[in-house]
């Protein structure tokens, strides 16, 4: 299963005015990476460096945080982790990415994937009024008498709750933090198991 793709370009040839590159699908095997590098002329002798000119895939918001000089091993590790997520976890990841939580590097995003259980996502909740109604009518967090309910300002209540709990409206729903974030991964190949380290 392809999680995302990256267009890998030979940096030396690019500096010479030639655009030589190919698409690599992640997760990738060592053989796929080595074959791609050979095909684009990155041989470790004349041409040693490459860069990524484009990313593509279905995880909304992920590519906003990936740069042209990302580590292929880390990208592959991230792709393996994402491939193991179910659809609800993908939606939570997309909401956290939309919020900008832990997105300063691929290592941060790897840690974000490891900590998705620290978040609660309420799918389809995209405005303060809906949030206020859910908290008052469904979850009964506030006891509002029936005769006052038609006049109650659900939008103001929802806004206050969102501000107080540090919530965020994302395209996939309303996101809150519900646990302590633990840094599991550090930029080190020690943390990347052999099957996910292609380069």
What name fits each language-model region?
Residues 33-101:
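Structured domain cores in non-transmembrane regions
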Residues 163-189:
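Long, highly charged low-complexity segments enriched in Glu/Asp and Lys/Arg with interspersed Ser/Thr
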Residues 111-168:
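Amphipathic protein-protein interaction modules
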Residues 70, 83-91, 95, 103-105, ...:
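Extracellular/secreted glycoprotein ectodomains characterized by long, lumenal stretches
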Residues 1-46:
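N-terminal ordered "arm"
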Residues 9, 15-21, 40, 139, ...:
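Short, glycine-biased loop/turn motifs at secondary-structure junctions and
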Residues 10-13, 28, 56, 156, ...:
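Short, flexible loop/turn elements at secondary-structure junctions
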Residues 190-199:
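Single conserved hydrophobic/aromatic residue that forms the stacking wall/gate
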